[in-house]
Regions:
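Cofactor-pocket helix-loop regions in the catalytic cores of large enzyme subunits
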Residues: 15-21, 176-201
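Glycine-rich helix-loop-beta junction characteristic of Rossmann-like nucleotide cofactor-binding loops
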Residues: 20-27, 78-81, 200-201
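Glycine-rich phosphate-binding loops that contact phosphosugars or nucleotide phosphates
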Residues: 28-182
Length: 201
């Protein structure tokens, strides 16, 4: 089960993730968070941003969903040198030219840049660039989430779940209970696929 693997991976890194975010929060009065992705990966940020804007004080943590194509087209509009920024890159392969270019531009343009790289491919360029960078938190997704097909069902849902786990304010035990319930619900739905197919036919 991809979601269980994603949660287990998060749980193993939970202390490091919390320390990473706390260090940023303690150092800066205002932090801009950019959820960035190319293609379907961009929709992860689009989906999550309204929720995080609701639960965070935007005077401290300001969440934004910006497609990498938009950042590359107008970098100076989205990346400000004097604004502490957490660039959260969502990427299935981690090799999209605009995703790689977004990271390069952010490094050039933002003085206080932090990164969280959420990707499904350990061998991708984004994952490789994150290695050894203390200001870049690499969160690799389960190998099974690296969809080979056109539809990015596993990668999309896995990356979205990980981002929720990273930024949600709930305690670990609450998160674990919610993920368990989510997995059970999904299994119930999948268990009814045959019944639905019979009705359709």
């Amino acid at each position: 089960e991809v979601w269980q693997e994603a949660f287990d991976s998060y749980k193993a890194q939970a202390a490091d993730i919390a320390a990473f975010l706390k260090k940023i929060e303690d150092k800066h009065d205002y932090i801009k968070v950019i959820f960035a992705g190319a293609g379907s990966s961009a929709y992860v940020g689009d989906t999550l941003t309204p929720y995080f804007r609701q639960i965070y004080d935007e005077r401290k943590w300001n969440f934004n969903a910006i497609a990498t194509t938009d950042i590359v087209a107008n970098p100076l509009v989205h990346l400000k040198r004097e604004v502490p920024t957490v660039l959260v890159s969502f990427a299935r392969s981690g090799n999209s030219p605009e995703s790689v270019a977004t990271v390069d531009l952010a490094k050039q343009l933002v003085d206080d840049l932090y990164q969280i790289t959420i990707t499904c491919a350990a061998q991708g360029k984004l994952a490789q660039q994150a290695q050894g960078d203390e200001k870049n938190l690499l969160l690799l997704q389960p190998e099974a989430s690296n969809d080979a097909g056109f539809a990015m069902t596993s990668s999309f849902s896995s990356m979205m779940l990980t981002a929720i786990l990273v930024f949600d304010r709930a305690e670990l035990a609450q998160k674990e209970a919610k993920v368990a319930a989510l997995i059970q619900l999904s299994q119930d739905v999948l268990g009814r696929v045959a019944d639905v197919q019979q009705l359709v036919e």
